[in-house]
Amino acid sequence: DMNTQLAQLVSDTDFSFGVERDDGRRYVYQRGSSRMQTSYESASTSKLVSAVIILRLVEQGYLKLEDKPQDRIATWPIAASSPLATMNLANLLSFTSGLTEEPLCVNAGFINFESCVNTIANANASNQITPGSEFYYASTHLQVAGLMAIKARGVPSWQEVFNEFKQQTGLFKNASYDLPSLNNPRLAGGMHWTGEEYLDFLSALKKGRLLNAASMSQLLVDRTATAKLVYSPAAALGEVWHYGLGYWHECQSTSFNCAPATRISSPGAYGAYPFWDRSKSYVGILARQGELGTFTKGATLERAIRPKVEAWLACAG
């Protein structure tokens, strides 16, 4: 029944769709040449992965959510007198740091990761934004958070941080942070992964295998309840969503009248759509790589099939 409906849906590109319910049973649908084992560019689906990796370092004692960039990065150029001097790791992971201006180096593979982070700081140094007051969806925040993690862990680059996560968890075995390059990976959108790998990650997160209870409660806080939502791609759906640490608190409404952490997701600009529905207790991903700016198309496909998926959740056997 789900197969039939998915086959009838109009899509601009082939996709794979996988969901896992509480008993571990999975339903998978693969359209055309797409497979759950197809490697796709992540776009913003990497945001949740990056945030969880960093939150594990907090849990392991290497970092604190209250840490400021200048506590970890010797070359951090923001003046102590600047309003931006109060930004901390929690602000960075929730995109409320005030770093709204995104320099070109974030997308330049030949640039040094650390020098680009300093370029990010300098590009925003005079903006007078108070950290925590404004939500602005951009790649800047996670680059700074990532460098804090690299320094706190005492390793040369994000690749060592990611490899340690892989070794500790067994997840994302063949995935990489390699866009625009391995030397200057964009933590907010620079992975390659397969749908199967991402679904395994969501499953482990849901089961409490990646974060302890205290870390999970930190992860699930609505970090933008009082922030002004200055730039949000969710507006393309005509909806108001809030933000946590590297993911969205969804709300299918023109105002945020939903309970936070009911349904969380980290969709990407190519239309891939990973989610954890906490009210119905299942995880899933619509894996695809359409044109840039097709975020809404992946979400729309998932919404079309959701009633059938929710019926499947209730089925025995």
Describe the predicted segments one by one.
Residues 2-41, 170, 249, 273-277, ...:
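A short, well-structured edge-of-sheet supersecondary motif
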Residues 3, 7, 55, 70, ...:
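Non-transmembrane alpha-helical segments in soluble domains
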Residues 17, 41-66, 142-150, 198, ...:
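Active-site SXXK
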Residues 21-29, 71, 105-131, 155-177:
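Short, charged, amphipathic alpha-helices and their helix-cap/turn boundaries
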Residues 41, 57-100, 126, 147-188, ...:
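Active-site helix/loop module of the DD-peptidase/beta-lactamase fold
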Residues 92-95, 141-148, 187-211, 244, ...:
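Active-site-proximal alpha-helical segments within enzyme catalytic domains
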Residues 172-189, 222-285:
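Active-site Gly/Thr loop motif
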Residues 263-317:
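Structured C-terminal helix/loop/strand segments within mature extracytoplasmic catalytic/sensor domains
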